[in-house]
Amino acid sequence: MSDTTDSTSRFRLGDDIHFSYDNQSQPTTSESPAPSSSNKKKKKKANKKHKQPVEATLNNPEDDYPTSRVIKQAPNGDVIVESLDDEASHQNQENHRHHHQYTNIWDSASIEEQENLKSFWESLDESSKMELVKIDKKSIMEIFKNETKANNQSHHGHGANGTSSASGANSAANANPVTPSCACKYCGRRSTIIEDELENIYDNHFDDIIDFIHEIRDINDLNALPGLLFGGFHMLEEEHKLQKRQQRMKHKRDHPASQNHTENPEVHGEHPHVQPQNFVNSRAPADSINTSVVDNRTPYPVAAGSIGAKQLQHQQQLQQQLQQQQLRQLQQQLQQEQNVHSQPQQSLQMQQQLNENDLPGGNTSDLAKHLEKMSLEDKKGEYTNERKIFQKLLDPKLVEVLDKVDFEKVKSGNYVGSASQANLFQRADCLREIVRDLHKADKTQLEQGLSFLKNISSIFSNSKTPFPADVTSNPRNFSSKFNDQLSNFAEDLLKNDGNSFIEMMESLSESRTAREDLLKDPTKKDAQAWVDEDDNNDSKRPDASTVKQPSQEYEYYEESEEDEEELSEEDEDDADDNGLNEDDDLVQDGHHDDSASDTESEISEEEKMQEIRRLFLIQVIKLFQERLKSAYKEKLSEDRTQKLIEELEAEENAKKERELKKLKQKEKAKEKKRLQQLAKEEEKKKKEEEQRAKEEELKQKQEALKADQRRRKEEAKLKREEEKKKRIEELKRKEEEHKKKVEAQQKKEEEAKKLKEERKKKAEEERKKKEEEKRQKELLKKQKEEERERLKLEAEENERLEKEQQELQELQESQNQLELESAQLPAELAEEINASPDSFSPTKNHLLEQLYQARPSSVSGPTTISPPIQFTPEAVPPVAAVSSVVPSVVPISPALSGAILNGTGSPNSRNAMLYGSSAQAQLPNGLNSSTSNMSPWSSKSRLNSTSGASLQSNLFQPQLSASGFSPFNDFSTPATSAGIGSVNVNAPLASTAVEPLAGANNGGVWNPSTTSSRNNSIWSNTPNLNNASIWGNTLPSLAGGAGAGASTPSAAHTLPNSAPLASDNELIQVAAYNTFQMLQNSNQLEFGAAPLMKLFSGVKLLLGNNALTINQLLSSCDSTSVYHFEFVYDDFGTVTHVKVNFNNGGLAQSLQSQAAPTLLNNTLATSAAGLRSSPPPGLGTKASTGSVPLSQFRFNINDANSPLLSNLGDWSSGNNSTNANGNSSNGGSRGLWN
């Protein structure tokens, strides 16, 4: 192999990468090209001995790995990084492969680092410290297993050197130095035996192990733990090493020839595992073992002159030797147990073989010396055993052991051989009490206890099973010695009342102190840096008899039974692994000689337990060391990470500051540009503003001109409006003056009427007192409700009355003028009639003739006049026949009849019914006014004048129904869809289509411009007025009083011969009959029935009472009399038409039977037109209607207290009201009256 630099690199599971360099060159050989594997290994071993550790230096510290490398995985799972062109590195790597397993921070750390670890331990809190010192089974087992693997690999490497002359198969099998384990039967059997023994030890002596750990150093004292970790157990190693050295020195002085047998290790056996008696031949010299141990245990090369390095190497050697000795003793014990159970004499044979091997030539003198030496040591051992018996007797755990012993099973087993032994076990409870109170016991109790122990020892010595607490090579000799010791102990205890016992305890304490001082001296000489202040207190510790009770010692370990079981398993496994390691070291070191069996017999049970305790203590301390190391590494890693983070943050902050500076500079540049741009924009804005200012000035001038023009127009408009307002105010003022005059005149008239009415009331009060009393009670209840409605209607009616009175006043004035102008017309007509009395034809209707002649042409409207209806003389029955039936009928004056026929008497029946106050003003003066009665038949009528045309058309124009509904569809015009409550007036009276004579081109009285004589009548002759008139009395002469303004006779004056009527109902019936007759004569009937509104208007005109309501008319017509009234209803149950007949002995003679068509009679008989002949439900009947005197209706229409005032709007209002007669009217949309 060429001379190359031995450079190996290693990377292990997250640890740092370590490089080691060796500058020594390996000499090349020119021997055979294929040397044996044993020679190579010997050369490597020699090289290892001469190799000296040097300080590590890195050629390229910045490189993480070599440039040419191979990454491999070791058998234990480690990752290995090697160079490609270095073949020797692989072999050197095998020697250093497991150096991390033996590395701990205290072996390689300097004093400064140890101080850092101590300060780190002190900085931890209580919980972290408790977590670090907690015994973990898994962790301890891992430590044992790692050491076992390392020792196995090292053991197989040395075994290959010792068996180089074996067969070819064995040589090939051992050629691989890195074999992790052996597959032979003996290795497996040995491992199994060791595991079982460790389990036994752990199960039976776990408390002793823990006691020992606490005895060395109180683990619960967390502040003292660094002293334990940094040197507490090394003191134990020094003590053990000193004892072993003394024994070896004595053994070498006594047997110097035994060293010669170690030079030929290849004489006996083919395999180191097959022959256990020859395993001592394969050991290496002690110096070479120590050298290899130091080499393997030094992971990092340190400086040559360093005090810490020397101390660490020294501690490593002590630790390795201690472990190897413990494992050798454990293996010897196992072999002794196997020999005892299988062949009791095997141990003697083995001792003989060992003596033969160690003493060739049969040197009996040396053997005799050796036996004498052993006898002396046995005597010393007896003395030490006596002391141990005291300690055992005073041990507080003896009580627990006795409590756990099941004496019943012992009785049933082979231990009990006689009745005395059975009785002995029966007194076990007494023994327990004696042991518990041993410190307070007297001599008798101590004698009983000692005698009991002697008997127990005799039982176990005679039995097949040895005493479990003391297992030696010769149990029978031990039992005899034990009996002797007990006897001596009893004798010493009984002497001087126990003073000898106290002296013995003091001597034990002094010997322990001297031993501790002896151990401390060489440590201080070698290295003072490792002296711990806690070790000075070891001399003050009490003896085993004064050790704390278990309840105080094991506070940390008494959490639960499960924890103790886990801990026992951990320590068991640890002891198992460590036993394997020590066994391997035993084979490597070859520390046995021919006197091994004699030395083993000297080792007592307590010493073996001491070794086991130390072994577990070492493992526990290793566990604590690794935990503290890992915690410290984590802390360092966190600190470095935090520092790195801080550095990164600082760098990031610096970077951000630089960026901020750049941004600020950019912002400044941008701000400068922005300011320049703003300056340019401001200049531009100034120019634009100047231009805008000029444009605004022009606009303002234009607007000023426009505003001036508008102002002028507004001023002109305001002037016109002011003038118009002035004109309107003047008109209003004139109207107000006119209204005042009219109101004054009306007040006078009302006062006069009130006086008349009061007189009438006084006359009638006595007669109607009883009736009124009854009615008053009912009226009082209803008046309260009427009062409310009256107040509402009064305000509205007052406004309407003012307007209508004004209009009526103007109309009256115009009528008065017309009457004055046509005052001479009746005189002329009378003269004509008187002049030709013989020419009167009885078949002619003189009344109609007079009415037709007297009709003023000014009343006719612009509408087209229908052609005249030709009446035959037979169409009208004789008046005498009528007068014979009708008792005394009020005659109707020509003016009144003309007014009725032409519509002047009732211009609008609907308005007449709605506004009762205006109806009085619309009547002719002869019926309603006390002023001078002017004749309306003057040809110089002012009704045709332009000024009064609009007023006349508004007053006399018929008001049609809004709904346009009519059962006959003759005179109605559909206009709008109004409610049902709007009545179809059908206004035939107000219509000009029913004029009897209407020829536009014909001359006559209807044409105001005609020049024909008034004597020409429609019948071509003039009736003789000298005869009796149709009214049965002579008309008064009107010629003489025409100019003087004589008033026309009123209705009261036209009935001088008439007797008073029986009741008011009869008066209303007579008026209704006369009105029906006039409508029949004027051909205004509709299918033989008179429209209700026309009939109602005529009745009010005849009676001169505008306060009369439709309900009163219908109730009066429904009462029994000589007249028979038939009502015709529409689909809504409203009365629309009335038919009047006579009730003459059951024979009804219709006044219109000859004039009505036959089709009408058939239609009325069969009700084909949908008319009803019977009243619908809800109409007033005879039973519900009382007779009301006529005087009840003669009230002033302007009187607010009139009981009939509320009945004026019954048919048009929708409110429930009650009239003066007690008739209820709900005002619904179904009918005009109910």
From Swiss-Prot:
Cellular compartments annotated: Cytoplasm
Composition-biased stretches (Low complexity): 161-175, 929-941, 1214-1227
Biased composition (Acidic residues): 555-587, 596-605
InterPro entries, per database record: NST1
Keyword set includes Hydrolase: no
Any single Pfam family the record assigns to this protein: NST1
Chief site of localization: cytoplasm
GO cellular component, one term: cytoplasm
Bias (Basic residues): 39-51
Coiled-coil regions listed: 633-826
Keywords in alphabetical order: Coiled coil, Cytoplasm, Stress response
Chain intervals for the UniProt region annotation (Disordered): 1-70, 149-175, 246-283, 513-608, 661-816, 924-945, 1214-1234
Top-rank taxon, per record: Eukaryota
Biased segments, Polar residues type: 1-10, 21-31
Biased composition (Basic and acidic residues): 263-273, 513-527, 661-670, 679-806
Chain's role: May act as a negative regulator of salt tolerance.
The family this protein is said to belong to: Belongs to the NST1 family.
Protein name: Stress response protein NST1
UniProt organism field: Scheffersomyces stipitis (strain ATCC 58785 / CBS 6054 / NBRC 10063 / NRRL Y-11545) (Yeast)
Lineage, highest ranks first: Eukaryota, Fungi, Dikarya, Ascomycota, Saccharomycotina
Gene: NST1
